[in-house]
Every structure is written in C-alpha cells, then in structure tokens.
Amino acid sequence: MDTNIINHYDIIIIGGGIAGLSATRHLLLKMPELSGRIAVIEPRSERRDNLDEDYKVGESTVEVSAMFFAKELELQDYLIENHPPKFSLQFHWPRELSKTDTIEDYYSTWAVKNPDIQAFQLNRCKIERDLLKMVIAQGAVYYHGRVRNVDNLDNDDMKSIDVEILSEVESGADFKLQQSIERITLTTDYIVDASGRNFTVGSRTDNILKDPKHLFGLDNASTWVRVKNTERSLFDFKSQDVTCSWTYDTNHFFGPGYWIWMIPLERGSRDYSIGVSYHRDKIQPSQLNSLDKFMSFLEKNQKLLYNLIKSGEIVDFHRWPKLAHTSKTFFSKNNWCVIGDAAAIFDPFYSTGMVMIAMEIECLTEMLKFKLSNAANDYHRRVEAFDKLIRCVTQINNHLIKDHSNHLGNASIMSWRIYFESSTYFSILLPAYIGKYHLCPIFSDHFTTDHENGLALRNQLLATLDYANENSINIGFMDNHRGGQLLGDWSPTSSWDYDHALSLAKYGHKRLNLPKCLSWSNFYLSLIICKLYYRVYGIGALWNSSFFKSLSNTTYRFSKFYFLSKLHSFNMIGTPNNDYYDKIQKDFKSYNYNQNNIVDWKY
C-alpha cells in the first residue's frame, strides 16, 4: 500500500454531509480565492448513488435555516425546483389515546396562512449529492477516504491528517465493500470537523458530552422510516378556514413521553420521513428497535400514521438508541472547530438542527476571514466570542427539550409551552439572524452575559407548567398560529416583525432594530406570564413569589430594551434601510424616458 503523499490546504473539512458541504460552499462563496485551497474528506464516494450510504433523518428547515440556504448559499431557485415547500410547524394531540384513526381525532394547531419567509423540506440524499457537485465546481478538492488520525489538535501548530483512500464500488453495491487503496497525509492550517457521530476531533480531545447531567436531564432516542408513494387521501384534510397547505408542513403527533414527525420529502409523490423521538424514562430503545415493533407501536398509538405507512412502500428503517450530545468547545483557539452533529444534537423538535448549523457556519466564515488575512488579534477575538455565543445558542436549544418527557402528551401543557417558545424564536432569534447580529463580537458578549438570566426565567415558566401537569389542571389550549388569544390580533408566529424588517428590506448588518424586537417580545411575554399564572393559580397568583419574579424580570427587560431601541433609532438617522434600494432611488433621479426614441433593429 502506498503511503505519505502529502498535500497542504488552508482549510480541511472532515465530513461531506450537509454541514460540511454547506460550510465548504459558504467559504468559497464569501472567499472565492480559496478555490483549490479547501479539501473535503468523506468516506462516501463522489458518485453518491447508493441509498444505503445516504440514509438521513428528513430535515425540516425554519425561517433562519431557510434564509441561510436561500441567501447565504445562494440556493433559492434550486430549493424551489428540487425540494418541497414548508408552510409551518403543526401540532396534533389525540382527543382520546385509544382513537387516532383520522385527523379529526386530534386537537390540532394548523397553519393559517402562507409563511412570511418561505422554508423548505430537504431531501438530505438529494441536497448532499447536489451540494457536492457544486463545491467541486467551485474549486473544493474531494478525497474519498476515511480519517485515521489527526495530529496537533492540542496546539495551534499546523495539523497533520492521516487519510485512508477508499475504492469505488459498483453502482448500487453495498457501501461496506469499499477497499483501502492507499494511505496519504494531508496538512492544513485549520480543521472543520463535520464528521457527525464519528466525532473525529471530539473523540480525540475529550470534547463530547453525552451524560444527561450535561444536557438538562435529556436522555432520548429515535426510530424512523422513509416511505414512498403513500395514499394521498389518508392525509388530505381540507378546510376553507386557511390559505395554505396542511400537507407540506412538518406535522408533529404527540403522546406520553414521545412525539412523531411527518415530513414530506418530495413534491407530488407523497414520500415521507416518519419517525419518533422518545424519552428513555418512558420508552426503552429495546421496545422500538425493529420495524415490526415500530409499526406495532404506531398501530396502537398513532393509527393514522400507521395506515399512511402501510399504504406506501417502506424505503428504509433506522434508529438511534442514544440521540443527544453536545460539546465543551465549538471554536477552539487551537485552530479547529466542530459543526453540525459533530458539535451537538438534542432533538428534531422545532427543527433547530439546521439553525445551529447556519449560525456555526456564518461565524466560522467570519472568523476565518481574519485568520486568512493574518489579522491575529481580530481572529482570536472572534474565536473567543463566537465559541461562547454558539455554546449559549446550543444550550438554549437543549433547554427547549427540558422536561419534554412529562409535557409532550398533555395538549394543554404542551400547547402553552409551544405558544411562548414560538414567541421567543420569532421575536428574538429570527430578528437577530436577519440583522446579522450574531456576527458582531460585541453583541455576542452582551448575549452571553444575559444568557443565564434567560434560562432562569424559562425554568420558572416550566416549573409552573409542571405544577399544572402534576395537579391535572386544564389551563386551556393555545394555538401559536392564531391571534385573538392574548391581546388583540397578536400571535407568536405572525406578529413578530415589530421593526417592519421584511417590508423595509432591512437585511444589512444591524439595520434591523433588534432592541425594539426584544422590547416588545418582553412586553408580550409579560402578558403570557400573567395569563399563564392566572390559569394555573387563579387569584392566588398574586401571592406567588415566582409570578412576581418572572413578571418583574420581563418588565425590566421591556423598559431596558425600549430605551436601547430609541438609541438605535437615533444612531441610524441618515442610514438607509437598504443600500441596494437606496442606490436605485438615487440613480433614478437621472432617468428620462423618451417614447419617440425607440432603438432600431434589423428587420
């Protein structure tokens, strides 16, 4: 076997899945001069024609991740042409656990309108194959091989990577038939670990945290199938009360200690990813470790989904008996980082996986701009700031799953939880992303300083829901899509754009008035707290110390951010909302239309 064929690259990305390929494309789009200077190492072949190699959980994007793919990766038209649209997240609880034959047997929150920002359902096999072709065309160097060793991860010296190059196999042949051809050594100044659960860097640096004590008690697992050509009429719920599809959404079906996703993978053909995320204190992995057991579970607990799968053809079956993990370090001072599943995964609920990837990749690119231009101080400033920021963002996404085991199956408790958690996402995270605040080290410092305070407030709200759940208190059913439940027509998913960022096209860095969004987010969260505590404790809420602590927290934050919003508005005087449209208006002043001066042509 040949060994030691050495090549050097500025950046090596370990892993050619959606995280690694998205990072590669983003880096090459923002810094085209990196063509030929980025390598991708992946054990799957460049051909990618074997489904057994490419099984994935169907990935549902939300507004943040959709904007990342459409704008940052410049894939808007590609997504429209190749992947199903996504209109919303929809949630369904059985009216009676023993009767789940049709959708009318559920209490549901349905999307009521088309989304403000178009999201997509991603067929992971398809998009990874297409992204691979794109990045190779952009100048990335692809190595079909497996990483065997990495040196110098504990210092900032140049890294050395031992790679086992693999053979191609016949089209459609078993992935495991690949043979080792040779061993080569690659060197690089920076490593991006996107190797997923192989944890190429994490396993060599003691960076992975899997114990539930590091995950807010989260101990979950997952089982799923892909199915094609299902019967359309089984989930063809029609209504004259809305203006959008109820099929091209991520539908969530709930039960005690578990929830099930239903994600369309193709347009028109009714192909789905259908899987369960469950908590191991309620269901053991041994109870769902085969297709027969999974189907038996659905037949007794979610008959509608059982019938849907039985009507089609099962493509594959997969399971993860241990789902959640996180990392100690995300961006290291030793010139490596972890992204995607190699960094953290908690639960597919709320479709947060690609949101984390989007922020990780944008921070990575921003950081490496300074490293590659030899601006050492600016680079190290961002390594520290972005590592703290991403750690806080992942902790928030982890905390979103805290106590799910006890809440998921209760339609009253969980609908309330979805209601206020949707408010936080739409009023805080989405505007911050639109305004690109996450790329500012100063914002990162402020965000991370306030992080523990935010988690403490959430803990108080979860404790209130725990009390209602343990005492079987019906606190009503909240629909996160509709207005008219809190104050006027306000709703978490439709009333978030307090600064009119979409209509004014405030997409530039910090053009959007984020303090204004934070201010009004806390105002409505204060109202949510008042209504929630009254539903749980009645008039006794006035004697509840937790109520006053929570309300004083949000009231103070409302006042604080209201003042900062006025300061932001003052500082933006004279700055256009959008440079592109401002330039059009200025250029148009010289426009002069002459209807008699048609340009001649040959005829």
Curated annotation (Swiss-Prot):
Pfam hit, one: Trp_halogenase
GO molecular function, one term: monooxygenase activity
Keyword Calcium carried by entry: no
Domain of life per record: Eukaryota
The keyword Flavoprotein is annotated on this UniProt entry: yes
Residues binding FAD: G16, A19, E59
Enzyme class: oxidoreductase
Residues reported in the UniProt entry to bind chloride: T352, G353
Disruption phenotype: Impairs the production of DIF-1 and leads to deficiencies in slug structure and fruiting body formation.
Keywords of the record: FAD, Flavoprotein, Monooxygenase, Oxidoreductase
SUPFAM superfamilies: FAD/NAD(P)-binding domain
Catalyzed reactions per annotation: 2,4,6-trihydroxyphenylhexan-1-one + FADH2 + chloride + O2 = (3-chloro-2,4,6-trihydroxyphenyl)hexan-1-one + FAD + 2 H2O + H(+); (3-chloro-2,4,6-trihydroxyphenyl)hexan-1-one + FADH2 + chloride + O2 = (3,5-dichloro-2,4,6-trihydroxyphenyl)hexan-1-one + FAD + 2 H2O
EC number(s) reported in the record: 1.14.14.-
Biological processes, Gene Ontology terms: culmination involved in sorocarp development; dibenzofuran metabolic process; DIF-1 biosynthetic process; slug development involved in sorocarp development; sorocarp development
Role, per record: Flavin-dependent halogenase; part of the gene cluster that mediates the biosynthesis of DIF-1 (Differentiation Inducing Factor-1), a signal molecule involved in the differentiation of pstO (prestalk-O) cells. The three-step process begins with the formation of (2,4,6-trihydroxyphenyl)-1-hexan-1-one (THPH) by the polyketide synthase StlB. THPH is then dichlorinated by the flavin-dependent halogenase ChlA. The last step of DIF-1 biosynthesis is the O-methylation of dichloro-THPH (or des-methyl-DIF-1) by the methyltransferase DmtA to yield DIF-1.
Similarity comment: family membership: Belongs to the flavin-dependent halogenase family.
Protein's UniProt name: Flavin-dependent halogenase chlA
